[in-house]
């Protein structure tokens, strides 16, 4: 396959959004979706082998105060561990590169660089966390200041059993400018004190959308 670019602009009667309504699979080169407005993924995107995906959105306005979104609805973008993923928001936005996560250990590894950007390339089975850290489970990712994009994937059976203090959740606490989107938690058990939530324990400055 060769590189493909799909682009919308301000012409016509629509809002310049891109809708993915049929599944697409490719194994090499880059698929770029460049939307004047939002990108809505309603059918699976499957980037296998060395394929890459670039989602550029909100290009009809500058990055500052840009409210455009990437959303998934009953679909996911599946990325091989060798695939690459980038996003750019706004006409003058800076491209963000992401680390692709396909394993539970990689998910926990987000704690090593909380300013980076991460994307789920597949669903994650987190059942093994019930025996981690003397059976207290997954260690919360604290002070997360990057972007975490589930791209329609889920994390199942996450286990955390912590004390009554601290910020407890997959993302224990957020930093300025953080974005968490398009990810779901299914099953599992998360317990702690007042600042506890399965997905985010304490969110004072971040943005969370299309997630559960």
Predicted segments, located by residue:
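Surface-exposed repetitive/solenoidal architectures
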Residues: 1-212
């Amino acid at each position: 396959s060769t590189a493909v670019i799909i682009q919308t602009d301000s012409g016509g009667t629509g809002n310049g959004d891109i809708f993915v309504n049929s599944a697409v699979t490719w194994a090499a080169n880059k698929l770029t979706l460049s939307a004047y407005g939002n990108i809505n993924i309603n059918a699976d995107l499957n980037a296998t082998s060395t394929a890459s995906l670039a989602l550029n959105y909100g290009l009809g306005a500058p990055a500052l105060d840009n409210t455009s979104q990437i959303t998934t609805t009953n679909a996911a973008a599946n990325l091989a561990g060798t695939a690459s993923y980038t996003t750019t928001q706004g006409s003058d936005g800076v491209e963000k590169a992401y680390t692709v996560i396909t394993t539970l250990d990689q998910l926990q590894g987000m704690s090593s660089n909380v300013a980076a950007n991460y994307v789920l390339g597949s669903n994650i089975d987190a059942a093994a966390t019930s025996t981690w850290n003397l059976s207290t489970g997954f260690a919360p990712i604290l002070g997360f200041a990057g972007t975490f994009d589930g791209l329609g994937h889920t994390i199942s059976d996450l286990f955390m059993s912590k004390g009554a203090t601290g910020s407890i959740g997959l993302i224990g606490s957020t930093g300025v400018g953080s974005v968490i989107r398009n990810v779901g938690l299914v099953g599992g058990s998360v317990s702690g004190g007042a600042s506890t939530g399965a997905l985010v324990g304490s969110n004072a400055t971040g943005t969370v959308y299309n997630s559960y």
